Design a protein with these regions (language model features):
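Hinge/lid segment of periplasmic solute-binding proteins
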Residues: 100-149, 173, 287-289, 375
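Long, aromatic- and glycine/proline-rich binding clefts that accommodate carbohydrate-like moieties
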Residues: 129-134, 289, 342-391, 395-398
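N-terminal secretory signal peptides and thylakoid transit peptides that target proteins
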Residues: 1-20
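A structural signal for short loop-to-beta-strand junctions that line the ligand-binding cleft
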Residues: 93-94, 122-158, 191, 298-301, ...
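Extracytoplasmic/periplasmic solute-binding protein
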Residues: 141-145, 150, 173-222, 227
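Extracytoplasmic/periplasmic substrate-recognition and gating elements
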Residues: 62-63, 160-162, 233, 240-244, ...
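Extracytoplasmic "Venus flytrap"/periplasmic binding protein-like
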Residues: 59-126, 161-163, 256-266, 280, ...
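Glycine-centered hinge/linker elements that transmit conformational signals in sensory
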Residues: 179-180, 219-248
Length: 428
């Protein structure tokens, strides 16, 4: 953290970063619920993202000296715990990032302020069609802070070493054949892919290719037992054939990237992950491409995920314009993008992305390329996770553990997953 940023942080909050987290988790804000007129801004991430955003907030307040910003941040899990506490106390930050599984949960809890016509909010970079796509059930109550899509990432260095190339038109069948062949024949004993049926966005793409949706418009689980079973079965065939890392090699169902990154040719991921994860193995070149497709994939299966942020419905009227200006800064500022980069996804503002591209890192340019490629595809509507579904990934991991331990068949695990998720939604 720069000296300027540290001074600004202490000026904004009056306490250190650990105190911010501790006070927030206790249900009381370091900014006194904005009682001093500060705009409270909450986000998640590691130390590098925290520093980048603090530096960006320096730039924002330099341009808007009349606006004070009180930052609140933590890692992803701590952020969600803090938000739960703040929701219960109705002490929510003025502007806040929204975890993917909580978009409708937060809406149903009444956290979002309607942004239609909000003074200070600049949406001039977006078309009317884009703005319509941002709405939830017709209401403009959240905005995308970044966007990304599922991809297949691969180690281009490993491919070159073997004199190999991925199939030009990737299908689930020909990718499986390729991974089996690579695992059996590469000179260094690497595996074709890390065991990854826990990857949520590739899973959703797989379902959509089968004509299903992960979530339906009316807030139900759209995935069928057959759809879930087909997904797990694709992975299990590879695992049993030795084409994936073993559970011991990746230390369980959900490995960290440093555990497996030099052991595999490919991994499924989100399009933005390459920015940070490639840095873990600087001696290798990584690239990425669209996920495989069924030969008879349902039309419009592609999707772009909006990572959203919002303004709290309880922001006092006299602070709405300042909060909206901070949101506009997040949407439109080249300076902010130059500081935070694309590790959290590409900006939804295409003009901003065009401006940034000449200075993007090589890995960020790969994010830009796939973002533009997928933006050109046909995309049918995608629906957010309903209230009560926030634990669905853990439920999937639980069933995958049962399968890999030999304690459940794939059909039984798929049925148990569907039953458990439906039960949690019904009980919400």
């Amino acid at each position: 953290m720069s000296d300027l940023t540290r001074r600004s942080f202490l000026t904004w909050t009056g306490v250190g970063a650990l105190s911010v987290a501790a006070m927030s988790l206790a249900g009381c804000s370091p900014s006194g619920s904005g009682g001093d007129g500060s705009v409270r801004f909450a986000w998640w991430g590691g130390s590098e993202r925290q520093q980048a955003y603090l530096e960006a907030l320096d730039a924002f307040t330099a341009k808007h000296p009349e606006i004070k910003v009180a930052p609140e941040f933590g890692d992803y899990d701590a952020y969600q715990e803090r938000m739960t506490t703040q929701m219960a106390a109705r002490d929510v930050p003025d502007v806040f990032w929204i975890p993917s599984a909580a978009v409708l949960t937060y809406r149903d809890a009444g956290l979002y302020r309607n942004l239609d016509g909000a003074s200070g909010l600049d949406l001039s970079a977006f078309s009317a069609e884009q703005i319509e796509s941002f709405r939830l059930d017709g209401e403009l109550n959240t905005l995308p802070k970044s966007l990304f899509s599922p991809v297949l990432r691969y180690n281009a260095t490993f491919l070159e070493d073997e004199g190999a190339a991925l199939p030009e038109q990737l299908t689930w069948d020909n990718l499986a054949e390729f991974l089996l062949d690579y695992s059996a024949n590469n000179a260094d004993g690497r595996k074709g892919v890390s065991y990854g049926p826990y990857h949520d966005m590739p899973f959703e793409s797989f379902l959509r290719q089968h004509g299903e949706d992960l979530w339906t418009e009316d807030g139900a689980l759209g995935a069928s037992v057959d759809g879930v079973g087909a997904w797990i079965d694709w992975w299990e065939k590879l695992r049993h054939a030795g084409a994936t890392t073993t559970m011991s090699e990746q230390d369980g169902i959900e490995p960290s990237w440093p555990q497996v990154g030099d052991k595999v040719l490919t991994t499924f991921a989100n399009s933005n992950h390459i920015v940070d994860e490639a840095q873990a193995f600087p001696d290798y070149e990584f690239d990425q491409r669209d996920v495989p497709a069924l030969e008879d994939a349902a039309a419009g299966y592609h999707f772009t995920y909006y990572s959203r942020f919002a303004m709290y419905e309880g922001v006092p009227d006299e602070r709405v314009e300042a909060a909206a200006q901070l949101m506009s800064f997040n949407l439109n500022s080249p300076e902010l993008l130059s500081l935070v980069g694309l590790s959290a996804g590409a900006p939804p503002n295409a003009e901003l992305l065009d401006q940034y591209e000449p200075d993007a890192t090589p890995d960020e340019k790969k994010v830009i390329a796939i973002t533009r490629e997928i933006a050109e595809t046909e995309q049918r509507p995608r629906f957010e996770a309903p209230a009560g579904s926030g634990n669905w990934r853990n439920l999937l991991i639980r069933e995958l553990e049962e399968v890999t331990l030999g304690e459940k068949s794939v059909p039984d695990a798929a049925a148990a997953f569907v039953e458990a998720v439906e039960g949690e939604i019904a009980g919400a």
